């Protein structure tokens, strides 16, 4: 079905770009059986623009659509992706600029590599490991944008007491072990996932490490997506020690971390004093960002 966005937009330089109202594509990421992320790519039909190259499902945005709606619709039309299996994480303008013609990449996750159904705009659809994408013949626009869209493995450390306190007056202090266990179970259930990092890049979180102190140390945690560190004294001291450790817990990051994609350590805390103690290169993430997953 043709929409009112189908057609060429002509820029001030005379260049033609597809999509009267701009265009959007869906970068859909999902965990493979080994826990590492794969993305859905299409091999563009030979008759299309830059045919024979790999890119994201996407196309022109209609005037009544948001960029998210357009990207999800195009993924359904071109790859048979069910919108109910798509969890949107972020949007990025990866070509052009807002206010004129632009291409927006919608970053999203699926719970697993989904089955696909190809239409005439592709000659193949494939779930490709992130570490394999650069070796493929990519559409020029996607190749230029890929470095800002790919994820880095994340080693995520939770200041659990601080995150629990950020949930508000829920009465968690009456049963701190129970509330801690419930919180960690909810966080684990949201993994693995793409996370937008404070520096504007993206990370892949497959597991978290939670530091427990005081009465919370007796919390029952059974999900293997959560590793527990019990602090004998201050939880902040334990978090600072873990963040500064020369040899991180590599089981908390995918096995494909390379020199190109080194794992980044992220500490989830709003504690200013703890943030100031973190080593150079460690990122701090607000508890509200993680609570937003739930």
Go through each PLM region and give its residues.
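Short glycine-enriched, charge-decorated loop/helix-capping segments at active-site entrances
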Residues: 55-60, 170-174
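General small-molecule cofactor/ligand-binding pocket signal
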Residues: 89, 126-128, 229, 285
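N-terminal leader/linker segments that precede catalytic domains of diphosphate-processing enzymes
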Residues: 1-53, 59-114, 130-131
């Amino acid at each position: 079905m043709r929409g009112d966005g189908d057609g060429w937009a002509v820029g001030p330089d005379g260049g033609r770009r597809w999509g009267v109202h701009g265009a959007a594509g869906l970068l859909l990421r999902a965990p493979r059986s080994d826990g590492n992320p794969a993305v859905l790519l299409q091999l563009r039909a030979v008759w299309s623009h830059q045919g024979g190259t790999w890119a994201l499902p996407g196309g022109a945005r209609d005037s009544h659509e948001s960029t998210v709606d357009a990207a999800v619709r195009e993924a359904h039309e071109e790859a048979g992706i069910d919108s109910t299996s798509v969890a949107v994480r972020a949007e990025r303008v990866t070509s052009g600029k807002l206010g004129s013609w632009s291409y927006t990449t919608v970053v999203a996750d699926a719970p697993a590599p989904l089955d696909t159904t190809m239409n005439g705009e592709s000659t193949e659809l494939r779930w490709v490991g992130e570490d394999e994408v650069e070796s493929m013949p990519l559409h020029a626009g996607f190749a230029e944008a890929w470095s800002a869209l790919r994820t880095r493995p994340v080693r995520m450390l939770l200041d659990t007491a601080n995150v629990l306190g950020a949930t508000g007056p829920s009465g968690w202090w009456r049963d701190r072990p129970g509330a801690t266990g419930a919180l960690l179970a909810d966080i684990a259930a949201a993994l693995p996932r793409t996370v937008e990092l404070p520096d504007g890049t993206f990370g892949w979180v497959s597991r978290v490490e939670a530091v427990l102190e005081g009465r919370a140390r007796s919390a029952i945690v059974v999900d293997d997506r959560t590793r527990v560190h019990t602090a004998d004294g201050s939880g902040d001291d334990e978090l600072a020690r873990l963040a500064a450790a020369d040899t991180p817990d590599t089981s908390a990051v995918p096995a494909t971390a390379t020199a190109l994609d080194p794992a980044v350590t992220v500490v989830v805390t709003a504690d200013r004093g703890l943030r100031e103690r973190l080593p150079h290169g460690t990122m701090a993430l607000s508890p509200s960002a993680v609570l937003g997953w739930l």
